[in-house]
A protein has these predicted regions:
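Contiguous, well-folded functional domains in the mature portion of proteins
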Residues: 1-125
Length: 125
């Protein structure tokens, strides 16, 4: 699931569920337009692996874009986090990719606008 942020959006990233941060991995890279498919592999990014209370793994990837040249992450390995908690930001747009386990229910559709801390985007099953 990908949420694109433009320069006018709120750039704070929030945890999709409650759990413990299993690891954080920063990868330097390019600053291609975030909507391009190759940005997934080539752009600067920061991945946060979350181990949920139910044992499911959820991966949140902050991806920098053409204008966004700074990723900030406030969590580290072993941190306990709550659903909706702010964990980072991407300055001036870009995108957030969230990978849920197979079988999870996606609660939004392509083109929907979401609001941080309010919109339920998916449910773990």
């Amino acid at each position: 699931m990908t949420v694109f942020l433009n320069v006018f959006d709120v750039h704070v990233n929030r945890m999709p569920c409650t759990g413990t941060v299993e690891g954080v991995s920063y990868q330097p890279g390019q600053f291609l337009v975030a909507s391009k498919p190759e940005a997934t592999l080539r752009n600067e990014q920061n991945a946060v692996m979350l181990n949920t209370e139910s044992g499911a793994k959820v991966l949140c990837v902050q991806v920098a874009g053409l204008i966004a040249r700074r990723i900030v992450c406030w969590v580290g390995q072993g941190d306990r986090v709550q659903r909706g908690e702010r964990f980072g930001l991407i300055r001036f747009g870009s995108r957030m990719d969230t990978f849920l386990p197979l079988g999870s229910k996606i609660c939004v559709s392509l083109g929907d606008r979401v609001k941080g801390g309010e919109t339920i985007v998916g449910e773990l099953r």
